[in-house]
Amino acid sequence: MMDINEIREYLPHRYPFLLVDRVTDLDFEAQSIRAYKNVSINEPFFNGHFPEHPVMPGVLIIEAMAQAAGILGFKMLDAKPADGTLYYFVGSDKLRFRQPVLPGDQLVLEAKFIGRKKTIWKFECRALVDGKPVCSAEITCAEREL
């Protein structure tokens, strides 16, 4: 549904911090999104985390979920960063890690809108590998004008 060129229109992040490769499902009725991050051994963070046993840092899994949620928020508003608005990741609740994410894994990112108070948005997010949950959290984002 969204290739990397369209994703770059909705996220201000760039290499090495753009963590969404593809969006395959965007459901406005269910207010949800499904996106993918292909985890390659060539990711720069594997040089130090950990050289002999590479594991994707948990904070980057959280960031990937937040980026998917950000795309959903922009799409729900029919807006883009170029319009002068950004979403900042400001917190997480109910965070759980269940298994490590390794080079060669495909991270499935799912986010569902659960509420909004003024400029604060909440999303229920989870990340899966091979259909198994690896991380889940409620992600909070703040909508800010540039």
From Swiss-Prot:
The record's family statement is: Belongs to the thioester dehydratase family. FabZ subfamily.
A single GO cellular-component term on record: cytoplasm
GO BP annotations of the record are:
fatty acid biosynthetic process; lipid A biosynthetic process
Regions annotated as coiled coil: none
Q: Which residues form the signal peptide?
A: none
Q: Does the keyword Lyase apply?
A: yes
Record-annotated active site: H49
Q: What is the lineage of its organism?
A: Bacteria, Pseudomonadati, Pseudomonadota, Gammaproteobacteria, Pseudomonadales
The scientific name of the source species is Pseudomonas putida (strain W619)
What gene is this protein translated from?
fabZ
Compartments in which it is found: Cytoplasm
Among InterPro entries, the record links this protein to:
FabA_FabZ, FabZ, HotDog_dom_sf
- Write the protein's name: 3-hydroxyacyl-[acyl-carrier-protein] dehydratase FabZ
Q: Give yes or no: UniProt keyword Ligase.
A: no
Reaction(s) catalysed by this chain, per the record, are: a (3R)-hydroxyacyl-[ACP] = a (2E)-enoyl-[ACP] + H2O
State the Gene Ontology terms under molecular function: (3R)-hydroxyacyl-[acyl-carrier-protein] dehydratase activity
User: What does the record give as EC number?
Assistant: 4.2.1.59
Return the PANTHER family for the record.
3-HYDROXYACYL-[ACYL-CARRIER-PROTEIN] DEHYDRATASE
